[in-house]
């Protein structure tokens, strides 16, 4: 039986992820883990996250779990989800936060005239009413299509163009295009899935994405990188 550790550093929807994994892979031993030795002992690791990047990195560091996540990323199948995907990169524009630096690249905010960004109050005030209505809201929230840019074992049984559920204001921008395995359009074409060696990570929430999200988790449990 495969043991899967869900990293619990205090900033994520860990129980929702656990329920989805239990449904997708009832033969697996799913554990929410908040101690390094638990993560070290697991066969596979799921690294979720939600909230502000400065808070996520601070709590990860303070929890003592950072080194365990880094060891897992170097040695066993690891799946990052939402902010857990973003944290794998070098830095985030959110608070200028240094991240784990496992992948080259940065995390950027949706920005530009096509977005009705609530943090840009002067932009909203200056915009004509019709133009403001046409702008895309930030955060990007809801179902959106994922284009698979290259084949991967975790895409097995999931049609290209499948819709997954997103909730985010920032997205990963890899320095190495070869990392990208999925792209979504929301005012800009952005990377929503990355993969290299034993790591696969997604911006969307598989646990909120119905049957295809469960299939992605099942594929992760079966994956032999």
Curated annotation (Swiss-Prot):
UniProt cross-references to NCBIfam families, sorted A to Z: IMP_synth_hisH
Subcellular location: Cytoplasm
Active site: 82 (nucleophile), 205, 207
PROSITE patterns: GATASE_TYPE_1
Keywords: Amino-acid biosynthesis, Cytoplasm, Glutamine amidotransferase, Histidine biosynthesis, Hydrolase, Lyase
GO cellular component: cytoplasm
Pathway: Amino-acid biosynthesis; L-histidine biosynthesis; L-histidine from 5-phospho-alpha-D-ribose 1-diphosphate: step 5/9
GO molecular function: glutaminase activity; imidazoleglycerol-phosphate synthase activity; lyase activity
Predominant subcellular localization, coarse grouping: cytoplasm
Name of the protein in question: Imidazole glycerol phosphate synthase subunit HisH
Biological source species: Bordetella pertussis (strain Tohama I / ATCC BAA-589 / NCTC 13251)
GO biological process: L-histidine biosynthetic process
HAMAP family according to UniProt: HisH
Gene3D superfamilies the UniProt entry points to: 3.40.50.880
Occurrences of domain Glutamine amidotransferase type-1 (ranges): 3-225
Stored SUPFAM superfamilies: Class I glutamine amidotransferase-like (SSF52317)
InterPro entries linked to this entry: Class_I_gatase-like, GATASE, Imidazole-glycPsynth_HisH
Catalytic activity: 5-[(5-phospho-1-deoxy-D-ribulos-1-ylimino)methylamino]-1-(5-phospho-beta-D-ribosyl)imidazole-4-carboxamide + L-glutamine = D-erythro-1-(imidazol-4-yl)glycerol 3-phosphate + 5-amino-1-(5-phospho-beta-D-ribosyl)imidazole-4-carboxamide + L-glutamate + H(+); L-glutamine + H2O = L-glutamate + NH4(+)
Function: IGPS catalyzes the conversion of PRFAR and glutamine to IGP, AICAR and glutamate. The HisH subunit catalyzes the hydrolysis of glutamine to glutamate and ammonia as part of the synthesis of IGP and AICAR. The resulting ammonia molecule is channeled to the active site of HisF.
EC number: 4.3.2.10, 3.5.1.2
Signal peptide start-end: none
Subunit structure: Heterodimer of HisH and HisF.
């Amino acid at each position: 039986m495969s043991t899967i550790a869900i990293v619990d550093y205090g900033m994520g929807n860990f129980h929702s992820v656990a329920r989805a994994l239990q449904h997708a892979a009832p033969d697996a031993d799913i554990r929410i883990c908040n101690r390094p030795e638990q993560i070290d002992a697991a066969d596979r690791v799921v690294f979720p996250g939600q909230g502000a990047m400065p808070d996520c990195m601070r709590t990860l560091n303070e929890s003592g779990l950072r080194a365990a996540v880094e060891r897992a990323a170097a040695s066993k199948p690891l799946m990052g989800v939402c902010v857990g995907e973003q944290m794998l990169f070098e830095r985030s524009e959110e608070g200028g936060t240094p991240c784990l630096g496992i992948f080259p690249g940065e995390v950027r905010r949706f920005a530009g005239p096509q977005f009705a960004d609530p943090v840009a109050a002067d932009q909203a005030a200056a915009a004509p009413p019709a133009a403001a209505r046409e702008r895309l809201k930030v955060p990007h929230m809801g179902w959106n299509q994922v284009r698979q840019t290259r084949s991967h074992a975790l895409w097995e049984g999931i049609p290209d163009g499948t819709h997954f559920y997103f909730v985010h204001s920032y997205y990963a921008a890899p320095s190495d295009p070869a990392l990208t395995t999925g792209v979504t359009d929301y005012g800009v074409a952005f990377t929503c899935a990355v993969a290299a060696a034993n790591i696969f990570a997604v911006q969307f929430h598989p646990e909120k994405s119905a049957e295809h999200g469960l299939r992605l988790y099942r594929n992760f449990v079966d994956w032999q990188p």
